[in-house]
Swiss-Prot record:
The active site is at E45 (proton acceptor). Transmembrane segments: none annotated. Catalyzes the transfer of the gamma-phospho group of ATP to thymidine to generate dTMP in the salvage pathway of pyrimidine synthesis. The dTMP serves as a substrate for DNA polymerase during viral DNA replication. Allows the virus to be reactivated and to grow in non-proliferative cells lacking a high concentration of phosphorylated nucleic acid precursors. Homodimer. Belongs to the herpesviridae thymidine kinase family. GO terms for biological process: DNA biosynthetic process; TMP biosynthetic process. It comes from Bovine herpesvirus 1.2 (strain Q3932). This is Thymidine kinase. Signal peptide: none annotated. Gene3D superfamilies: P-loop containing nucleotide triphosphate hydrolases (3.40.50.300). It catalyses: thymidine + ATP = dTMP + ADP + H(+). ATP binds at G17, A18, H19, G20, L21, G22, K23, T24, R187. GO terms for molecular function: ATP binding; thymidine kinase activity.
């Protein structure tokens, strides 16, 4: 009788950050580092889901909807003598729809993988590392937040998308990749991928979203609570949000010991979440912020400058593994995870990847 497969230690690494940094090449370099007993499985960006699995192309659709929002916003600003406070409702609805399309494959994959995981425990079967090209937080929070700063979606749209973030299984490690702005622009221009958005306002808004995400996770993991100090926060008005998407303004800094004012929550303290000018935040919005806080507090966050070559960046990520959280999976899950990685890579990116040895 065959001996049952032994339990595995599973390390999940989500490479994230603004687009055009080199996350995908770093992920592929990590997959190439797979060795017996220390397998690395790579789950690439789900480009096919966005571009070919539906009648409409999500990248083209969201670019068109964003342009419509920008046109409406500029018209409102001229009429009111200042920045528009809200996005055009119809165009914002389209942006939110396409943003949900971006989130869907990540949410589906996240649910599939999470079902195989358990809290950490003895794992005599060795370690497998799962490397994902982005976490659901990218499509559910960071990119919607950037669009919120640009008034392409409204606060209620952002909370709706953020509420879709799934509960986190044990062992989630988020590696936020960074680059100097000029190098990011150079890499974006060099890859020249159709559908890439490279306007300076959007890029700085996304970069700020990730800096605030790092601060928010650190604040929450240190025991911070958004409800403590919420009432004392200043209102995030249209000018404050516009500054987060203004290349001429200083970018947000990743603070060593962030306070509530250094987090995403501060930018969500806006009057549009208080219907009719009420004095209190509606309970349903507060519950959404509670849920968001719970999801983000579960993430172990690392920051990686990816200026170096992909192999060097991959080595730097592997050097972080001893400090990373892990989950456990039964021995049979190893083969299931390898199959998932092959299927996902083939369907989403047209890549036929082999599973690592030992799984």
């Amino acid at each position: 009788m065959a001996e049952p497969a032994r339990a595995l230690r599973v390390v999940r690494i989500y490479l994230d950050g603004a687009h055009g940094l080199g996350k995908t090449t770093t992920g592929r370099a990590l997959a190439a580092a797979s060795t017996a007993g220390e397998g690395v499985l790579f789950f690439p960006e789900p480009m096919a889901y966005w571009r070919t699995m539906f009648v409409t192309d999500a990248l083209s659709g969201i670019l068109a909807a964003s342009a419509r929002c920008a046109a409406a916003s500029h018209g409102s600003a001229r009429g009111a003598g200042g920045p528009a406070h809200r996005a055009d409702a119809d165009a914002a609805g389209l942006v939110a729809y396409y943003q949900a399309r971006f989130a869907a494959p990540y949410l589906i994959l996240h649910a599939r993988v999470s079902a195989l995981l358990a809290p950490p425990g003895p794992a005599p079967g060795g370690t497998v590392t799962l490397v994902f090209d982005r976490h659901p937080v990218a499509a559910c929070l960071c990119y919607p937040f950037a669009r919120y700063c640009l008034r392409e979606i409204n606060a209620e749209d952002l909370l709706m998308l953020a509420a879709a973030m799934p509960p986190e299984a044990p062992g989630a490690n988020l590696v936020v990749c960074t680059l100097p702005p000029a190098e990011q622009q150079r890499r974006l221009a060099a890859r020249a991928r159709p559908g890439d958005r490279a306007d300076a306002g959007f890029l700085v808004a996304v970069r700020n979203a990730y800096a605030l995400l790092v601060n928010t996770c650190a604040f929450l993991r240190a025991g911070g609570a958004w409800r403590d100090g919420w009432d004392a926060l200043e209102w995030a008005d249209a000018n404050a949000l516009a500054a987060l998407a203004d290349p001429s303004c200083d970018e947000c800094k990743m603070a060593p010991a962030p306070a509530l004012r250094d987090t995403l929550f501060a930018a969500l303290k806006c009057r549009e979440l208080y219907p009719g000018g009420g004095a209190g935040l509606p309970a349903v919005h507060a519950w959404a912020l509670d849920a968001l806080a719970g999801r983000l507090a579960a993430l172990e966050v690392f920051v990686l400058d990816v200026s170096a070559a992909p192999d060097a960046c991959a080595a730097a990520v592997l050097d972080m593994r001893p400090a990373m959280q892990a989950a456990c999976a039964d021995g049979a899950a190893g083969a299931t995870l390898a199959t998932l990685a092959r299927q996902f890579a083939l369907e989403m990116a047209g890549e036929a990847t082999a599973g690592p040895r030992g799984l």
